[in-house]
Amino acid sequence: MSCPNNSGNFLMDPLMGGSSSFRDEGYSSNSGMYIHTAAECGYSVMKVEPSPLSKSRDVPAGSVLLSSFQDAPYLSAQPSTWTPGTKSSRDQQLVAQCLQPCSFPAGNVKEEAFCCFYQDGSKRKQTTESATYIRLRDNRCGPEQTTTQARGCFQMYNREEPQQDDQLFAPACSLLHLGTSVESQSKISCSKFATETGKDERKEEKARSDGCSETSDNEELKGRNLQSQRTLFLCLNVSAILLRNSRVLVFGNSHDASSEKTTGNWLKAKSGRKKRCPYTKHQTLELEKEFLFNMYLSRERRLEISRSINLTDRQVKIWFQNRRMKLKKLNRESREREQGVVYNYC
């Protein structure tokens, strides 16, 4: 019979008859392993585990070395009920397809340190299916399969009948490698974490957009308030300036008119009319100084003064004539006042 290219598959039909593990009969010739007896465990469940002799040289009295049973078959005709040391293997079972049995000498198979679990042999007569030895591949091929978290362990159960708490294993069974489901759990946790992070990022983006919109609205409102305040302030300033100007125009003009009527101004006469030939202060000052120094000007001096104060020769000549006439008028008025005072005393 052909066998697939797998070092872990071998024929177990010739090995099913023989010794029993309950009677302390070993499996193969391996000086590095020994089997604990049922009397040592204290219950009907028997646990097989690798124990190097280099680390445990003192072998217990109830244990039997595998090296003492070189010609014993590998498995017994009626396997006892073996259960794993942890409760997780009772709850989580791995279901897989049985491979076709292959025939090659079992002596060429390399011994490995693993645990084998068997079911009660009372129900072995119910079925005639052949038991195969299967080592499963990694969990990444079947993420939907759940496995126990125990490496190097093998569990035997029936592929046709469902497992119960009281009936753990079937007689026609498969040896399956129990791996860990860390990768599937990590994938699920990573997907959950990615979805949660995506939701958090979306919430943060929404909050930021809402905050930005609120800040922009607040800035717009502040800008509008500032503009309205500025316009109101400008309107108040303009109204205040207009009120001041109106007051100055109303009250100031009347005050100026009354004062000009009594005293007069250098631009206006006593009557309030505007003078016909107004001069600037600088021009009148220069002409007054020159008139006090000399009431009559020569032609050369008149030209010099007109050039210095930016006036024409004729304007300077007319101003001097008017000033002399004014001086004569003032002298005559003063003389008349003096004569009137003298006459009053008489």
Swiss-Prot record:
<feature type="DNA-binding region" description="Homeobox">
    <location>
        <begin position="272"/>
        <end position="331"/>
    </location>
</feature>
<dbReference type="InterPro" id="IPR009057">
    <property type="entry name" value="Homeodomain-like_sf"/>
</dbReference>
<dbReference type="InterPro" id="IPR017970">
    <property type="entry name" value="Homeobox_CS"/>
</dbReference>
<keyword id="KW-0217">Developmental protein</keyword>
<keyword id="KW-0371">Homeobox</keyword>
<feature type="region of interest" description="Disordered">
    <location>
        <begin position="199"/>
        <end position="223"/>
    </location>
</feature>
<dbReference type="InterPro" id="IPR001356">
    <property type="entry name" value="HD"/>
</dbReference>
<dbReference type="InterPro" id="IPR020479">
    <property type="entry name" value="HD_metazoa"/>
</dbReference>
<dbReference type="Pfam" id="PF00046">
    <property type="entry name" value="Homeodomain"/>
</dbReference>
<keyword id="KW-0539">Nucleus</keyword>
<keyword id="KW-0805">Transcription regulation</keyword>
<protein>
    <recommendedName>
        <fullName>Homeobox protein Hox-C10a</fullName>
    </recommendedName>
</protein>
<comment type="similarity">
    <text>Belongs to the Abd-B homeobox family.</text>
</comment>
<dbReference type="InterPro" id="IPR046333">
    <property type="entry name" value="HXA10/ABDB-like"/>
</dbReference>
<keyword id="KW-0238">DNA-binding</keyword>
<dbReference type="GO" id="GO:0000978">
    <property type="term" value="F:RNA polymerase II cis-regulatory region sequence-specific DNA binding"/>
</dbReference>
<dbReference type="GO" id="GO:0000981">
    <property type="term" value="F:DNA-binding transcription factor activity, RNA polymerase II-specific"/>
</dbReference>
<keyword id="KW-0804">Transcription</keyword>
<comment type="function">
    <text>Sequence-specific transcription factor which is part of a developmental regulatory system that provides cells with specific positional identities on the anterior-posterior axis.</text>
</comment>
<feature type="compositionally biased region" description="Basic and acidic residues">
    <location>
        <begin position="199"/>
        <end position="211"/>
    </location>
</feature>
<dbReference type="GO" id="GO:0005634">
    <property type="term" value="C:nucleus"/>
</dbReference>
